[in-house]
């Protein structure tokens, strides 16, 4: 059994820890920003996580550029976020998960995935579950429905990028059990796993935070499914903590990285 590669969001504090030999990772996770890709590659291998929006009014990326960045960095998969929007489906209620809403949303998502597959091949496309925040937000609930996600994977032959924190946020909104939801997703197609801490910040549940004991338990449970053969071993497990810019700098603590990256490295290595 080969273990997944451990990736962590690139940040200067993380790069300093890597350079000092205080933590070990397999590669950095970076957005499709040329300057950040260059900074990460100066410190070690990296892969690109693209801002592709599936089910929105536009994909949000230049697919030819994405293909070139994949080649330049060795990024193995072109990811897309399953984000069907009210703008694209003005006559579908946000909370509608009836058969017709699911059919329409799935058909549009399949069409968008096929646009990606035409550039890189379906086997190199992965789709990511995103957090559903309720009917007062713009994301259609059908986009997080496991039946829709499963149909997209079945119809296109793409893989799944499972974000455990996003799944937790979704199930908290819907009042569902986390594992009932996750196990209904097409985990047989798992290619990449994202993990991060989830806790309330200013009265709202947020992710991309330090792991709590509960978060670590969720990661252990996911890895146990891989160890038991219920899930395939993904290519990467990415710790989505830290980063650059105002969105991430306030949650980029070197002490957290120094403690939690080795913990995740140990957990991931246990699969090898």
Where are these regions (language model features)?
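N-terminal pre-catalytic "stem/leader" segment of glycosyltransferase-like enzymes
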Residues: 1-14, 23, 32, 244, ...
């Amino acid at each position: 059994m080969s273990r997944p590669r451990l990736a962590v969001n690139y940040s200067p504090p993380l790069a300093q820890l890597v350079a000092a030999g205080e933590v070990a990772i397999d590669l950095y996770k970076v957005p499709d920003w040329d300057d950040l890709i260059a900074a990460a590659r100066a410190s070690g291998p990296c892969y690109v996580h693209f801002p592709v929006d599936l089910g929105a009014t536009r994909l949000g990326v230049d697919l030819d550029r994405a293909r070139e960045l994949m080649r330049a960095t060795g990024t193995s998969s072109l990811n897309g976020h399953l984000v069907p929007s009210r703008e694209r489906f003005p006559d579908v209620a946000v909370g509608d998960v009836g058969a017709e809403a699911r059919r329409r949303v799935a058909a549009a998502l399949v069409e968008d995935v096929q646009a990606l597959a035409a550039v890189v091949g379906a086997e190199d496309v992965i789709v990511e579950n995103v957090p559903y925040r309720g009917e007062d937000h713009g994301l259609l609930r059908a986009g997080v429905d496991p039946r829709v996600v499963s149909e997209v994977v079945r119809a296109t032959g793409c893989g799944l990028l499972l974000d455990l924190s996003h799944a937790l946020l979704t199930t908290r909104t819907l009042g569902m059990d986390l594992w009932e939801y996750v196990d209904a997703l097409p985990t047989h197609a798992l290619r990449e796993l994202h993990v991060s801490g989830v806790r309330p910040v200013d009265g709202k549940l947020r992710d991309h935070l330090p792991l709590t004991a509960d978060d670590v338990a969720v990661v252990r449970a996911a890895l146990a499914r891989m160890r038991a053969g219920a899930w395939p071993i993904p290519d990467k497990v990415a710790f989505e903590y830290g980063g650059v810019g105002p969105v991430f700098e306030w949650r980029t603590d070197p002490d957290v990285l120094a403690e939690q990256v080795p913990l995740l490295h140990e957990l991931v290595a246990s699969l090898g």
